[in-house]
Amino acid sequence: MSRIRKYSVLLLCYVLLLCCVVTAPIPAKADRAAQSPQFMPGVTEEMTDPAFWSGLTNDPDALLATPEEMAQINAAAIATEGSNRRDMRSLKETYDGVARNQALQESAADDVKYYLGWIWDQNGKKLEQEDFDIITANVIDPNATEEMSVRWGIAVNRTDLITFPWDGQLLDDPSDIDFDYQPLVGIRVNEPVAVYSTSADGKYFGVTTSCCTGWVRVEDIAICKDKEEWLSAWDLPAEKRLVFWGDKMYTDYSNSASQASGRMITMGTVLERMEETDPDALVINRLPLHNYAVYLPVRNEDGSYSKRPALINARECVSEDYLPLTTANLAKVALASLGDAYGWGAGLNNEDCTSLNHSIFCCFGLDMPRNGTWQQLVESMPRIMIGAYTLEEKEALLDALPLGSLLNFPGHQMMYLGKQAGQYYVVSTVSSLMSPYSGKRQRTRCCQINTLDIKRANGKTWISELNRIFIPWVSLSEGEEYPQPELPTYHEYTSFVLEKGLMDPYPTGYFLPDRASTRAEAVEMLWRIAGKPEPDMEAEGFSDVAAGSDHEKAALWAKQAGIYSGEDGQFRGNTALTGNLLDELCQRFLDDAPDGLVPQTDDVLTRAELAQAAQAIWTANEAQKLPETTAK
């Protein structure tokens, strides 16, 4: 009986436990709203409306540049050595194929030197020299001769111009297959290319576009019978152009026109409009009601070019000829790609930062150099170099900039939208930045609007890193400068100390030139001029300078070098700096300080005055370094 009773008790406990599990209430999840589109801090939904930004301009429909003026800007870019812009109409029709093979080998070898040691393929294999040897062997055209004729090609698909004639990816992170260094630039449907070589495996053409040179898949290019047919495909008169200015669209599917079905059309694509015909005439088996009838290029089975009718819905983002370059139209095109994925080199059928701006301006007939490095070579394009501007000076300049100006810092380009509620806004396609929520590096990989106080992955704000501004539609005469706000009298000195790294802005980013300078700032400045020598960290320092504090090394150096001994064993770094004290420090710092090098006064020096003195001290110190020379 005891054993039966024992199992009965165990069974009862199990049943009770099961009841508890079944009947116990499940903790309710916190109510969460369904996901909605996210925006960066400070960005609202109304800011995604182009009219929000163009409405900040007095006359958003005023013409910023005429087609003739933009043609002159295009010509200036083409004439600029190193811009990689070329007039496709003027390309020579013959070339030395053997010499080109040699040039391709040398160029590929240079690319390998750049990538070797930090690149993986899509299978997670780190690429070694022997891997690159196999890849680069494919650049050789086995049929090259000393005298060859250019083959004139037309892109039949939106495709990528890539670095190597190779099906693989070039990844800096084997876990991140969406960031591929292979693409150089996107090639749009109906874009012309000049074909100079075929890869050893026959899968790729070596081509030149209007802005870049690289490799493209053979199946994406149709070869015209001659240059005349090639020119007729893309060098269109204004009355025949249809320009797509949205992010992307796809042609309708039709069983009777499979070659024209489902074709991706991307920003900046220019297609040929068909001539008007009988109103009852069918286009791909239907009337072209509410549609533009156009021609799309196709590649025949033998690789040759032909064109087929297609329909483009008139409700798409299309324009008869290039859009007039106005503020309203610029805002409309600039925001058309919001939310699209980032694609390095215009990969993933999308854009990177500079290719987006290139595509935007192509919608107006302005064909800029492909990237910021090449753009800055064009002398006639206004280039305002602001790397050494204080934050106050940058803000004054931004206040005067028009929408559509291109702002740059190393590694990124963005388009300026305007100022709202004291914040400066830009649109760009971004790979990564410091998350404003977690403070960690985050892959945004998106075309987005954000403020300039957002931080890069290095922790610095975008506005603090700005170093160049371009205004693409303005052409300057030789020696002419783009008008900008008058710089303050102290700009020479503040820009000097910022460029040399002798003084820093405050953590807010502002230089605050009128604020009183301090002893710590003066000692820090002298230490930096001296080259930041390492002091004896074990030696006795100042009682009020904590280990690891901002000015610890500078303070120790100044004490050990006999430049500044402090007061009563204290550094007193936050004490205001007078001209006389700076003069004393200067006399001890320089072997032979010139008279009047710094202000000799009991008045407190402002940060602008300290910057002026820093420039003078730096110059005197450099002069003392120069070896004595004998005049001949």
Language model segments and positions:
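Sec-dependent signal peptide cleavage junction
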Residues: 21-32
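Boundary regions of SH3-family modules and the immediately adjacent low-complexity/disordered segments
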Residues: 31-162, 166-173, 178, 194, ...
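...with weaker cross-activation on analogous glycine-rich loops/strands in unrelated enzymes
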Residues: 186, 369-437
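Feature responds to low-complexity, polar/acidic, surface-exposed segments characteristic
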Residues: 480-492, 499-500, 504-523, 527-554, ...
